[in-house]
């Protein structure tokens, strides 16, 4: 799920379904709009997969997408200002231009058991 830097919409647009453990929305409000003070209640949730959000601050990044059995699907180029939610399947990256990015994902980190590494190929099967 990619939100390009030039994406614009009115109001609040959620890109994720309610059952995703990581929610991603775009918000556009006029000056003076009030978002009421609030806090989020402590709620127990079960999270089975890590979902990551990447914000590209600077540079260019190629993202390769794989299905759950490591088959190559497609690639996309991310540029400065783009945001991506990696919600399922596998992914790999090639830095095309010097890169600065911010990664956000669920914790706590569980060490080596958190991910399975594999040899990726850009050939479709």
Describe each PLM feature range.
Residues 30, 56, 79, 86-87, ...:
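A short, compositionally biased micro-patch
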Residues 26-48:
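Conserved short histidine dyad/triad with adjacent acidic residue
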Residues 67-88:
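Short acidic-glycine-tyrosine-enriched beta hairpin
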